[in-house]
Amino acid sequence: MHSEAEESKEVATDVFNSKNLAVQAQKKILGKMVSKSIATTLIDDTSSEVLDELYRVTREYTQNKKEAEKIIKNLIKTVIKLAILYRNNQFNQDELALMEKFKKKVHQLAMTVVSFHQVDYTFDRNVLSRLLNECREMLHQIIRRHLTAKSHGRVNNVFDHFSDCDFLAALYNPFGNFKPHLQKLCDGINKMLDEENI
């Protein structure tokens, strides 16, 4: 049998927990809404087309729908988290300087991807792989203080796939199955370059 004091304590605890749960639910919903609004501003139509094409080529190359979805989801999550950190001024001066280098490296990567497609006999999978791995290393340094080991794992999952020399060779094979995908990817990347979105 409980005393009145114990019962009122339990009731107060129940109320506190209920309110706490409600606040947590609100935060979760608000967090999703904020993430969704940021995602829609970050991932415009052109970016979305490029991501869709990356998904299609990855799915076709891996012959694994689940793995392709995971790689693209990890790419999107990484981009959004990076943007949230950047927009909320979470980076120190060193990280901001590294972020500027990273943006330039991604721009160089995009130009190289398109150039290798447009100019016959220039493709070099080792050059692309090296550029991708340089981007990976910079990204790890930028997010080191801010994101979890799980996020670093996502970065590795994305870059392990896209920097794989066999994948790149298959993608750029002029007689291979991926030629239409590469054309669409390069069209989208070119548009992003023209719009200064990359």
From Swiss-Prot:
One GO-annotated biological process of the protein: positive regulation of apoptotic process
InterPro entries, sorted: TNFAIP8-like, TNFAIP8_sf
Molecular functions per Gene Ontology: cysteine-type endopeptidase inhibitor activity involved in apoptotic process
Family of the protein in this entry: Belongs to the TNFAIP8 family.
Coiled coil: 49-83
Pfam families named among the record's database cross-references: DUF758
Keywords, comma-separated and alphabetical: Apoptosis, Coiled coil, Cytoplasm
Annotated GO CC locations: cytoplasm
Superkingdom in the source lineage: Eukaryota
Species for this entry: Pongo abelii (Sumatran orangutan)
Localization per Swiss-Prot or TrEMBL: Cytoplasm
Biological role stated in the UniProt entry: Acts as a negative mediator of apoptosis. Suppresses the TNF-mediated apoptosis by inhibiting caspase-8 activity but not the processing of procaspase-8, subsequently resulting in inhibition of BID cleavage and caspase-3 activation.
UniProt protein name: Tumor necrosis factor alpha-induced protein 8
